[in-house]
Amino acid sequence: MTGTPDVFPPATPGGAPLVALPAGPRKPDQVKGKLYIKTHGCQMNEYDSAKMADVLAASDGLELTDTPEDADVILVNTCSIREKAQEKVFSQLGVWKGLKNKGREVIIGVGGCVASQEGEAIIKRAPFVDLVFGPQTLHRLPELIRARREQKRPQVDISFPEIEKFDRLPEPRAEGASAFVSIMEGCSKYCSFCVVPYTRGTEVSRPFEDVVVEVAQLAAQGVREINLLGQNVNAYRGPYGDGEFADLGLLIRTIAEIDGVGRIRFTTSHPLEFSDSLIDAFRDVPQLANFLHLPVQAGSDRVLSAMKRGYTALEFKSKIRKLRAVRPDISISSDFIVGFPGETDADFEKTMKLIEDIGFDHSFSFIYSRRPGTPAADLEDTISDAEKHARLSRLQERINAHAAGISEKMVGTVQTVLVEGPSRKNPNELTGKTENMRSVNFPAPARLIGQFVDVVITEALTNSLRARVVAE
């Protein structure tokens, strides 16, 4: 690799859309090849990876492969939430470097939040990398690849062209009965531990009509479950009508009216934005799944203040109480950070009490990971690693016990399952998910794949349920 990287500026001042990429047949001079994508991190990254594949299929005719050795273009979509995830990326890049040493003309690109955070530093650390692009510039991949091949030097584009990404994506392609739809990007909360505002930018909502059109297109292709995505999804304020804005509650109500949409989910939420309008949607919209992921992070007001979360434990419990008034049996999952700088034994016990009071069904819980550039990175950390691991173990054991109890109570009940496909453990059975995100395996004919089916839960296992189809 020769030359210094080209750094792409925003497309136009303010991020105005460029000419849309073609979504139709490949041009005669386009080279058909193979594309491999490795995805780390959250559901938003999974969505972005799918869009990378869509863009490169439309522009260059690239087809996905499960084997990097067969690929002409290799992309890694990165996550910078935790240090270990970041280091895994460079370890993986080192493996792929060997493919270039074999004389193949392979394009290797790094996208996602690590790319946004590190930029040209990635090229300096791994000079064999050809492309570095941020979450907001994945739509420019065809241009970046073309420029790399023509100019013979690496290309870097980690700009924040606001909503331009969505204006230039091909029409969505359904991959099964469930689909992700991104409705907003970025976060403006600036929690003291979090890198998201720095890697994905501040909150920008997609226009209301654009989201509704995408959902309708997916439903017409057989999608039955819509997962609305955003770093702070319930802060959605989509331009709507003449100078007005639609919130998440209105968006959910509108999507529920689209023919074919049988279940709606959304993630990830922030407690500050969990509004009465959204609670009313849980009351009024039966398609809205009986499940909520609402990250609380801690149960101590002192720690929540240090995290700059903007609410107290009592305020969090008040919102859950109002929600359960309209959905008494709703399952609640959350995120927890254990060992945040300055967290005392008393602080941790308050987190454990909150877990007991709420009865969380599931959690994504981690030991605090210092992220350079965030305010919390400057806080003194006096908690031993042994204590952090002990606290995490206690927390996870408590939540797992709650989850097991909920699963046991489901035995004998009728649950509606969206059938995803054959079971991985037994191809003669089907598998699907309940509203509260339980995987269910049951004997049934393959013609039910992609449909909602009522089943009776017959057994609760550690990580799944067993069931039988309700006789028609």
Curated annotation (Swiss-Prot):
[4Fe-4S] cluster 1 binds at C42, C79, C113. It comes from the Bacteria. Pfam families: Radical_SAM (PF04055), TRAM (PF01938), UPF0004 (PF00919). Binds 2 [4Fe-4S] clusters. One cluster is coordinated with 3 cysteines and an exchangeable S-adenosyl-L-methionine. Residues 408-471 form the TRAM domain. Residues 173-407 form the Radical SAM core domain. It is an enzyme of class 2 (transferase). Keywords: 4Fe-4S, Cytoplasm, Iron, Iron-sulfur, Metal-binding, S-adenosyl-L-methionine, Transferase, tRNA processing. Residues 33-150 form the MTTase N-terminal domain. One of its GO terms (molecular function) is 4 iron, 4 sulfur cluster binding. Its EC number is 2.8.4.3. Its cofactor is [4Fe-4S] cluster. [4Fe-4S] cluster 2 binds at C187, C191, C194. One of its GO terms (cellular component) is cytosol. Its main location: cytoplasm. The keyword S-adenosyl-L-methionine applies. It is found in: Cytoplasm. It catalyses: N(6)-dimethylallyladenosine(37) in tRNA + (sulfur carrier)-SH + AH2 + 2 S-adenosyl-L-methionine = 2-methylsulfanyl-N(6)-dimethylallyladenosine(37) in tRNA + (sulfur carrier)-H + 5'-deoxyadenosine + L-methionine + A + S-adenosyl-L-homocysteine + 2 H(+). Residues 1-24 are annotated as: Disordered. Disulfide bonds: none annotated. PANTHER family: CDK5 REGULATORY SUBUNIT-ASSOCIATED PROTEIN 1 (PTHR43020), MITOCHONDRIAL TRNA METHYLTHIOTRANSFERASE CDK5RAP1 (PTHR43020:SF2). Catalyzes the methylthiolation of N6-(dimethylallyl)adenosine (i(6)A), leading to the formation of 2-methylthio-N6-(dimethylallyl)adenosine (ms(2)i(6)A) at position 37 in tRNAs that read codons beginning with uridine. Monomer. Belongs to the methylthiotransferase family. MiaB subfamily. HAMAP family: tRNA_metthiotr_MiaB (MF_01864). This is tRNA-2-methylthio-N(6)-dimethylallyladenosine synthase. It comes from Stenotrophomonas maltophilia (strain K279a). The lineage of its organism: Bacteria, Pseudomonadati, Pseudomonadota, Gammaproteobacteria, Lysobacterales. The gene is miaB.
